[in-house]
């Protein structure tokens, strides 16, 4: 998931303090999730149905979640929601445990096309919760969407000082790497450097970086073109801002937020029950409608309104997904990306 607003940070920190005192209690479950990622009343519904009380705390980046799990090694959390390549990183480091899918009676509701991704083959360690993509956002009132077909178009001089980029090193570099014909998951220092040099050429066109909610600058009229998350664009359209999503010919950037059980979780059985609850069609529908991002749950998608379920910006066709690329862990190369990214922003 991508970072949203920061107004829940203090609440998340308070809940974190409670979770540090995690008791070995099968009637209590400690759930650490992204902000604004669970509909109001949903966890209370789970408690009513199962008798398991959920202590809920939130984070706004994978880095924060990862650091907390590294810090609290006594089993502070029972369920977490890492994104794409963090699933890969955490399973390789032994931070999350294998999931007994035989206890997930609702697992069959998931779209087979959303399973068995490179970051977790066979979904041994993670269960899809929400997915999304980064593509090109276009304010149709200001820019003809048909005039933009590729990431490369963002480099045109006519867009000087008018673009928005997400404030995410991997995403920004993945865009440039795809433009150059490389994998967005490359670990080759020369290819990453080439992307950095390509991005330096783009900087005169960049007006802002935003990963709190990249639709906001479009809605405020600050930008009319740039990177966008498809769910963020959908929410903006619902609010009246005409943001079109263009799937670049070089391919979109796909990510998934998945449910995972920490290796030292104290209430594994409770975590499995909550995962199974969240896989229920009626529940997954609530989640998708609340946060505005696509659900990987086919049974839930059938319950959505046709307007939403058939929206190709939310649910692109198989060819569009195949042409894109899922983010994966790049290991030690992540520091190379971050170093170049900071240089890029400092040199604006």
UniProtKB/Swiss-Prot annotation:
Binding site for spermidine: 36, 85, 168-171, 327
GO biological process: putrescine transport; spermidine transmembrane transport; spermidine transport
Entry's localization field: Periplasm
Primary subcellular site in the record, as a coarse category: periplasm
MF annotations from Gene Ontology: putrescine binding; spermidine binding
UniProt KW keywords: Periplasm, Signal, Transport
Keyword ATP-binding carried by entry: no
InterPro entries: SBP (IPR006059), Sperm_putr-bd (IPR001188)
One cellular-component annotation, GO: membrane
UniProt signal peptide: 1-23
Role, per record: Required for the activity of the bacterial periplasmic transport system of putrescine and spermidine. Polyamine binding protein.
Family: Belongs to the bacterial solute-binding protein PotD/PotF family.
Protein name: Spermidine/putrescine-binding periplasmic protein
GN (gene name): potD
């Amino acid at each position: 998931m991508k970072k949203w607003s920061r107004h829940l940070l203090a609440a998340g920190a308070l809940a974190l303090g409670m979770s540090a005192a995690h008791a070995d209690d099968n009637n209590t479950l400690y759930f650490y999730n992204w902000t604004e990622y669970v509909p109001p009343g949903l966890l209370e519904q789970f408690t009513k149905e199962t008798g398991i009380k959920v202590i809920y705390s939130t984070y706004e980046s994978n880095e924060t979640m990862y650091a907390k799990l590294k810090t609290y090694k006594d089993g502070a959390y029972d369920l977490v929601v890492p994104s794409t390549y963090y699933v890969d990183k955490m399973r390789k480091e032994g931070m999350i445990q294998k999931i007994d899918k035989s206890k997930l009676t609702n697992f069959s509701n998931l779209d087979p096309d959303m399973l068995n991704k490179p970051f977790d083959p066979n979904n041994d360690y993670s269960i899809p919760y929400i997915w999304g993509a980064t593509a090109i956002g276009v304010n149709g009132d200001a820019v003809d969407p048909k005039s933009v077909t590729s990431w490369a178009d963002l480099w045109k001089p006519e867009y000087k000082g008018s673009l928005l980029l997400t404030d995410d090193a991997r995403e920004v570099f993945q865009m440039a790497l795809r433009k150059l014909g490389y994998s967005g998951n490359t670990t080759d220092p020369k290819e990453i450097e080439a992307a950095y040099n390509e991005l330096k050429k783009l900087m005169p066109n960049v007006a802002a970086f935003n990963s709190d909610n990249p639709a906001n600058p479009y809605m405020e009229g600050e930008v009319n073109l740039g990177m966008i998350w498809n769910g963020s664009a959908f929410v903006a359209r619902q609010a009246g801002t005409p943001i079109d999503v263009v799937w670049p010919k070089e391919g979109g950037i796909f990510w998934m937020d998945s449910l995972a059980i920490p290796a030292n979780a104290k209430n594994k059985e409770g975590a499995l029950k909550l995962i199974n609850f969240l896989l229920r069609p009626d529940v997954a529908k609530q989640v998708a409608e609340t946060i505005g991002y696509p659900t990987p749950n086919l049974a839930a998608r059938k319950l959505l309104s046709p307007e939403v379920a058939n929206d190709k910006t939310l649910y692109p066709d198989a060819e569009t997904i195949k042409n894109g690329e899922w983010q994966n862990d790049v290991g030690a190369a992540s520091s190379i990306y971050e170093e170049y990214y900071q240089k890029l922003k400092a040199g604006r």
